Amino acid sequence: MEAEKSKQNPGKKPVEATMEHVLVALRETKEKREIRIQKLFEFFDNSKLGFLDDTQIEKGLSSLSIPPKYRYASDFLKVCDSNRDGRVDYQEFRRYMDAKELELYKIFQAIDIEHNGDICPAELWEALDKAGIKIKDEELASFMEHVDKDNNGIITFEEWRDFLLLNPHEATIENIYHHWERVCLIDIGEQAVIPDGISAHAQRSKLLLAGGIAGAVSRTATAPLDRLKVALQVQRTNLGVVPTIKKIWREDKLLGFFRGNGLNVAKVAPESAIKFAAYEMLKPIIGGADGDIGTSGRLLAGGLAGAVAQTAIYPMDLVKTRLQTFVSEVGTPKLWKLTKDIWIQEGPRAFYRGLCPSLIGIIPYAGIDLAAYETLKDLSRAHFLHDTAEPGPLIQLGCGMTSGALGASCVYPLQVIRTRMQADSSKTSMGQEFLKTLRGEGLKGFYRGIFPNFFKVIPSASISYLVYEAMKKNLALD
C-alpha cells in the first residue's frame, strides 16, 4: 500500500496525498472516521434539526473557545454551504471534512521534512521562517504547547488535525499562524491600542502599507474639513463657519481647502512605523518576564508609543498648521521657505511649540475611546443582538466612530490650545494660552471648530475602513 510505503521511508518524498494516506496517518478505519464526523456534526446540531445554520455554528465554536469576533462561523458556513441555501446539511459537512483533512495532511507533510509522521519544534520553526514569520523561542514553545495535547514535544497529524479542523480558511502556514494568534495567543478587541502579535509578523510592512494608504485617502478626502477646523480654532472672534469658508475660497479658491494636506498625508507612514517600533520596545518593560501586559498595559504601552511617535513627527505637524494659518496677499508660501523662516527667526525649539498639550491628551483620549467603545459594543450585544453573537463590522465601525468622537470631544480644549500655540510665533506657554483663551472668549473658546471636527468622524472612519479592507484583500492579508 502506497500510504504504508511513504510512512516507512522517512527520507523519501511522499507520493500525491489521498484520503487513504489520511486514514493511515490517523490510524483510523473508514467506519471509525465516519462515526467521528457524525458525532462532530451532532455536536453542532444539538437541536436535532438535521442541518446547521449560522447560530448553531456560532454557539458550537464559542463552546470550543473560538472567539466570535473573528467571524469563523460565517466563514465556515460559506465554505460548507455548497448549494447556498444558508444552511449546512450532513453531506455538505462531510465533504468539508474530507477536503479539510486532506488539505491539512498535505501541509503537515510539507512541514514534516523528515517524513517521519510528526512535526518537531525545529521543523515548525523552519516552516514559519520560510514563510517570513519571525517568532521568539517562547512563542514557538507556546505554539507547540497549544497543539501538542499529550505534551511529548512533537505534533502528530491527529493533534494537527484537531487544532485546525474547524478553521475555515485555506491551510497555509501564514493562515495557521494567524489562527494560533487569534484563538490561543491574543485578544484584540481594543480600538485605541496596538494589537499584540502584529509587529512580530513578517507581514507587518503590508499592514502598515494598508493602513498608510487608508490614512492617506481618508485625510485627503476630509482635508477641507480639517482646514476649516484649524481656521476656526485659531480665530478669536465669532466669524462663524460660512464666513470662514468664504474667506478660504477668496484667498486660494478650491486648493485653499487642501493647504497642508501633503504634510498631513506624509505623516501617516513614519508615525505608524515609529508607533509600532516603540510599542514593541515598551511591551517587555511593562509586561515583565511573562510578556502578558493585559488591557491596561496595552493601553499604557499604546499611549506611550503614541507619545513617542507624536514627538518624532511633531515638527511636520507644526509646519502643517503654519501653512494652513498663513495669511499673505501673495498667496501660499513655499514649504521650504516657511520651514527655513521658522528655524532662523524662532529657533529649533519653535518646531515643538504646543507639544505639551498634545502629549497630555493622548492617554485620556485612548482611555475614553476604549471604555466607550467596549460599552457601546456591550449595549449593541444586549439590545440588538440579544447576546447571541459578536457585533459585525458595521456595528463595530459605528461604535468606533461614536467612541472616537466622544474621546476627541473630551480632549478637544487641549487640541485648541495646541493649535493656537503652533500658529503663534510668540513664546506663549500652555498656561498663558489657556488663561488668554478663558479670559478673552470664555469656555466656548475652547470648542471653536468642534463641529467640522465632528463632521470629519463619519467620512474619515468610513473611508479608512473601506480602503483598509480593500488593501488587505489586494495584499492577501485576509
Swiss-Prot record:
PANTHER family: SOLUTE CARRIER FAMILY 25. It comes from the Eukaryota. GO terms for biological process: ADP transport; AMP transport; ATP transport; calcium ion transmembrane transport; phosphate ion transmembrane transport. Ca(2+) 2 binds at residues 148, 150, 152, 159. Its main location: mitochondrion. The N-terminal domain can bind calcium. Gene3D superfamilies: EF-hand (1.10.238.10), Mitochondrial carrier domain (1.50.40.10). Expressed at high levels in flowers, leaves, stems, roots and seedlings, mostly in flowers. Calcium-dependent mitochondrial carrier protein that catalyzes the import of ATP co-transported with metal divalent cations across the mitochondrial inner membrane in exchange for phosphate (Pi). Can transport phosphate, AMP, ADP, ATP, adenosine 5'-phosphosulfate and, to a lesser extent, other nucleotides. Binds calcium ions Ca(2+). Mediates also calcium uptake. This is Calcium-dependent mitochondrial ATP-magnesium/phosphate carrier protein 1. It is a multi-pass membrane protein. InterPro entries: EF-hand-dom_pair, EF_Hand_1_Ca_BS, EF_hand_dom, Mit_carrier, Mitochondrial_sb/sol_carrier, Mt_carrier_dom_sf. GO terms for molecular function: ADP transmembrane transporter activity; AMP transmembrane transporter activity; ATP transmembrane transporter activity; calcium ion binding; calcium ion transmembrane transporter activity; phosphate transmembrane transporter activity. GO terms for cellular component: mitochondrial inner membrane; mitochondrion. Counter-exchange transport activity is saturable and inhibited by pyridoxal-5'-phosphate, EDTA and EGTA. Activated by calcium Ca(2+) and manganese Mn(2+) ions, and slightly by iron Fe(2+) and zinc Zn(2+) ions. Repressed by copper ions Cu(2+) and slightly by magnesium Mg(2+) ions. Magnesium Mg(2+) ions promotes slightly ATP uptake, ATP-Mg(2+) being exchanged with ATP(4-). It holds the Pfam family EF-hand_5. Residues 1-207, 280-302, 374-396, 469-478 are mitochondrial intermembrane. Belongs to the mitochondrial carrier (TC 2.A.29) family. SUPFAM superfamilies: EF-hand, Mitochondrial carrier. The gene is APC1. Residues 32-67, 68-103, 104-134, 135-170 form the EF-hand domain. Ca(2+) 1 binds at residues 81, 83, 85, 87, 92.
